[in-house]
Design a protein with these regions (language model features):
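Soluble, non-transmembrane domains of envelope/secretory-pathway proteins that act on or interact
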Residues: 7, 24-149
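Surface-exposed, Gly/Pro/Thr- and Asp/Glu-enriched linker/hinge segments
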Residues: 16-25
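Flexible, gly/ser-rich surface segments that form the specificity/activation loops bordering the active-site cleft
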Residues: 10
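Serine endopeptidase catalytic core focused on the charge-relay Asp
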Residues: 2
């Protein structure tokens, strides 16, 4: 579940500048208060890379020096030189997990002709006939897919 969330950072979030690499990537950007540090942690199915940008004596890096602007380009340069597309295997889906194409605005299984979809991982016990269920009280939740994480 965490991997699919972090894949979303690359597909739709602050790591989207990596999408065009066409690799199976997941990651997270970070920026501290007052932009004194910026970082990006990213991974493939067999490699983890962390990039930190900051100073020994904390000083602001600059107003717009965020994880996606300062650290992500360094990650990109490294991953372009070290990972071949043929080496980038898909992430394995853990046992007892189900991948489902959902509409992110409703959390429900996407209809066949839906244009706005994402793939999310759910505990298999929380999926019944294509519907995602609360694990606590076994009722259908259509409002917040994040309740399953």
């Amino acid at each position: 579940q965490v991997t699919t969330i972090l894949e979303g950072v690359i597909k739709r979030g602050t790591g989207k500048k990596l999408r065009d690499l066409q690799l199976n990537l997941a990651g997270k950007t970070g920026t501290t208060n007052e932009n004194t540090d910026a970082w990006f942690i990213g991974f493939t199915s067999n490699l983890v890379i962390g990039v930190y940008v900051g100073m020994d004596n904390p000083k602001p890096l600059g107003k717009f020096e965020t994880g996606s602007k300062a650290a992500l380009p360094i990650f990109r340069e490294f991953i372009e030189k070290s990972v071949k597309k043929s080496d980038a295997r898909p992430f394995k889906v853990p046992e007892k997990m189900t991948l489902m194409v959902v509409d992110p605005s409703t959390g429900e299984k996407a209809k066949f002709n839906s244009k706005n979809t994402i793939i999310e991982a759910y505990k298999s016990k929380n999926v019944l006939n294509g519907k995602v269920l609360y694990s606590d009280n076994n009722r259908i939740d259509t409002n917040n897919i994040l309740k399953f994480y």
